C-alpha cells in the first residue's frame, strides 16, 4: 500500500524555514500567539480605533483653519486635475480619436455606463443583475447574504462558506464603475454620467462609515477604492456637479482611507508580502502624490515609494514573472507597478533603473504568455482582479491582458507593443499618449520563449502555441495562488484552444470547488497513487505544502523541431517514491505535438502504483472515438489525437480513455462544460506513456 504521509508540525516548520528563514518563522509563531491574546480584547470591544474624518478633523488634516478650508479645497480641486498621468490638454485630441477611430470602444463605454446608471452590474460571474435603488453595498447579490454594516471591520469573518461570497460586495465597492462614468462624461459631455458618479460616491459614503462594515474588512480593496476614487474625482473635477461641499466630503473619506491603510497593512505573520500588500502600497502612493495638501501625504508618499521599490525586488522574479504562480495575479501586480511608475514619472519621483528594467520584463512575460487570440492562459488562481479598468469595462474578456502593453508602450517606448495591445492600446491615452504621434503598428514577435525563474516554457509559431507549466510553489514556498499543475500543458492550434487549464471558479464561498479546481487531477498532467503534487493543508485555502521541485533538463527551440524535457519530484515524498518526467516534442513540418511521460520508482522495490492521466479540453472541442485514438472536432478544424500508448516491461498497450464531462472556468464565478479525457494504468514502474495531437490525422472511419 502506497502511503502519502500527513503534514505534521515538523513538516510545516521545515517548509517555513526553507521558504522564509529562521527569523520569519519565529516571528510568525510569536504573532499567532499574540493574536490569540489580542482577540479577547477585540471581543470585549476595548480596541476600536475610529477612522472617521469629520469637519474639524478635515481642517486639521489639511493643516488649515476653518475660515481657510474652502480656499484650500478650491486650490486642491484646481490642482487635482493635473496630478494624474492623464493630460487634460490632450482631451480634445483623445475625444476626437474615440469618435472617429475608436467608435466601437466609445459605443461599448457608453453602453456600459448606461448599465451602471440603471444600477445593473455583472459582479464576478453573476451575470447582469439589477441592484435596485438605493444600492445595498453590504449584500452578496449571488447568495442574498447581507453583512451587518454596524460591525467593526476586524470582527467580520472572510469565509462564511455555504455559497456566500464576500468578494462580491468588495468588487462592487472597489469603484471601477466610477472611473467608467467619469470617462463617459468626459468623452461624451453627458451630464447624467457625472451626476450618477457623484451620487453613487455619496451613497457609498453614507452607507459605509470608515472602519465599519464588510467594505472595510480587506485593506486591499480599500486601497483599490482610493485609487479609483482619485481617478474619477480628477477626471470630473472641473464639472459643476463637483461642488466644494461634496468635494470636501470625498477628500475627508480619502483621508480616512489613507489612515486606515497605514494602520492595517497586509503583511503575513511570516513577514511575506504579496499582491495585497502591494495594493496597499499603491493606494498610499496615489493618496500621497495626489492629495499633497493633506498633512500625512508626505509620510504616505515616502513610505509608498520605498515599499514600491522593495516589493518589486521581493515579488518579481529575475525573468519578470510574479512570484505567486498565477497568471491572473501577474496581470494585477504588473498593472499596479505600471500605474505607479507612470504616476511617479508624472510627479518627477525617481525610481531605480532596476525597478524599470524588471517592470519591462513583466510586460515581456505577458507578451510571451498571451496566445495568438489575445487571451492569457488560466494558470493558478484568478479572481478577475484589477487595480483600475480604463478600457474595456464590461465588454472585454477578463483573460485579455493586452492593456498592459498600452501602458507599457508609453513607459518604455516599445513600438511593437502597440500591435501587441490590439484595441487595448488606447489604455495609453489615459497615461499621456498622443493619438497623432503613434507610429504605424508593427507585428509582435511570435517565437518560442522561456521564463526559467518563473517556470513558463512556451513553444510558439505563428498561430500555434504550447505552454508547459514548470512553475514551483511560489510566494516563498507558501503557494498562495499556486495550483497543482506541474508539467501541465496548454495547447492552442491554428486560432483555437485545444488543451486548457481549467482556471479557478470560486474562493471561500465554495472551498470544495476551490480545491477541486486547484487539484492535480483537474489539470493536464499525471496523478500518482491518488496523491497531490503538493499536499493541500487542511483548513487552509490559499497555500500548498511545498512538496515539489521542478527541473528542466532540455530546452531546444527555434527550429522545425522543438523539444522540452522537465521533471518534478512531488511524488518522492510517498512511502514508495516516484518521479515524473515529461517530454514535449513539436514537429512543425508534420504539424504534430507529442507528449511522452516517464514515471520511475526511486527505490528498488517492485511495487504496484496507480497512475492516472487527465486531459481537459476547451469547451468548443468535441471528441469522437476511433480505433487508435480520437478525433478532436472544433468549429473550424478537425485534429487527430493519437494514443495513448502505454509501455511497461517490454509490453505496450493502448488503454481506452474515458470521456468525462468536466468544467472550465473562463473567469471567476463562471463555468462552462468541457470534455475531459482520463485513462489509468496500474502496475510496477517504470512506465512510459505517449500521445500526440496532429493536423494530419487519419481519415474518418
Where are these regions (language model features)?
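Boundary detector for helix-to-coil junctions that initiate low-complexity/charged tails
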Residues: 1-29
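Beta-strand-rich N-terminal accessory domains
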Residues: 20, 28, 40, 56, ...
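Extended, charge-enriched "interface" segments that sit outside catalytic cores
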Residues: 31-160, 167-171
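Aromatic-lined, polymer-binding surfaces characteristic
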Residues: 146-150, 155-159, 165-363, 375, ...
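Residues that flank catalytic or metal-binding motifs in active/ligand-binding sites
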Residues: 173, 280, 362, 453-455, ...
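C-terminal substrate/ligand-recognition segments
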Residues: 175, 493, 595
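CBM-like, beta-strand-rich accessory domains located in the C-terminal region of large
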Residues: 223, 382-383, 389-394, 405, ...
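Carbohydrate-active enzyme catalytic cores, enriched for enzymes
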Residues: 321-499, 504, 553-557
